[in-house]
Amino acid sequence: MSSSSTNNTDPHIAVLAFPFGTHAAPLLNIIHRLATASPKTHFSFFNTSTSNTKIFPTSKHGGELLNVKAYDVWNGVSEGYVQVGKPQEDIELFVKAAPESFRMGIKAAVAELGREVSCLVSDAFFWFAAEMAEEMGVPWVPFWTAGPHSLSAHVHTELIRETIGVGGSFLIY
């Protein structure tokens, strides 16, 4: 979608996806629903190339909707890097690079569209997205892709630790 076919005052929503597991697909699903309901709103969907290729219906990441565009961000793995085999290494590398990768992606989308971001939507555990939204002066909408039980566990982590214990002092049944 070129900037010539858009109105610079229409909303521009930046969406930050977590590319691992099943996080990105449900987020894209809700974005597609919002894009259908609000055709003048542009949604810039930031994700890794690998994940975008898997979840978008076309190989060019354009999707079916003209107001949703995928942008590829860096996965955090430098060229020539040899992974050491830690189970979560790819996730750790991505999360370390994500804040700057997303900032660069947003900057490119704003330049391409000629529209500033008016709202930031992200996977809920991207803590840095709140800071990014504050820096941009826009609302942040964290989206929880998992079920309510895991959210409850995260919200009540301290209570669980106080009740059950951590380290060497575990509650034994």
Annotate the PLM regions.
Residues 1-173:
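Glycosyltransferase specificity loop/lid
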